[in-house]
């Protein structure tokens, strides 16, 4: 049985990897072996950080809500508990946006939370 070298397949695979490595520094964008390692590592980082991004944004929203809540005389946990008791179903992203862009509306939410905590 004759030997099959697989030239076109190999070339396509290498071309695909080098295309993904476009913009990398040094040998990482030019040499297949190094580029392949870096592309695999980059894809792992991308997969991990797509999940990390969700956690990072949640943390950021909580920090912003906490800062605004303390200006209104509440802690973050008491504000969120008060809103839950009031039956207000707005997520942290929206509450954080109100805290940054519309302090008056956030103050109304804080007052609502305070009122429901004292019941």
Curated annotation (Swiss-Prot):
UniProt family annotation: Belongs to the bacterial ribosomal protein bL20 family.
UniProt KW Flavoprotein keyword: no
GO molecular function, one term: structural constituent of ribosome
Keywords for this protein: Ribonucleoprotein, Ribosomal protein, RNA-binding, rRNA-binding
UniProt-listed PROSITE patterns: RIBOSOMAL_L20 (PS00937)
Protein name from the UniProt record: Large ribosomal subunit protein bL20
CDD domains reported in the protein's UniProt record: Ribosomal_L20 (cd07026)
Pfam families documented for this protein: Ribosomal_L20
This protein's record includes keyword Ribosomal protein: yes
Cited InterPro entries: Ribosomal_bL20, RIBOSOMAL_L20_CS, Ribosomal_protein_bL20_C
Source species, domain of life: Bacteria
Function of the molecule: Binds directly to 23S ribosomal RNA and is necessary for the in vitro assembly process of the 50S ribosomal subunit. It is not involved in the protein synthesizing functions of that subunit.
GO terms of biological process kind: ribosomal large subunit assembly; translation
Signal sequence, start to end: none
Source organism phylogeny: Bacteria, Bacillati, Bacillota, Bacilli, Bacillales
One Gene Ontology cellular component: ribonucleoprotein complex
Gene3D superfamilies, sorted: 6.10.160.10, Ribosomal protein L20
């Amino acid at each position: 049985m004759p030997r099959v070298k697989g030239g076109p397949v190999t070339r396509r695979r290498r071309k695909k990897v080098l295309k993904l490595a476009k913009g990398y520094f040094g040998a990482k964008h030019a040499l297949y072996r190094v580029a392949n390692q870096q592309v695999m590592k980059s894809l792992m980082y991308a997969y991990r950080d797509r999940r990390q991004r969700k956690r990072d944004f949640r943390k950021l929203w909580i920090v912003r809500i906490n800062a605004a809540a303390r200006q209104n005389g509440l802690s973050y946990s008491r504000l969120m508990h008060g809103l839950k008791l009031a039956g207000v179903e707005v997520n942290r992203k929206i509450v954080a946006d109100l805290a940054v862009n519309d302090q008056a509306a956030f103050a109304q939410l804080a007052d609502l939370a305070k009122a429901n905590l004292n019941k």
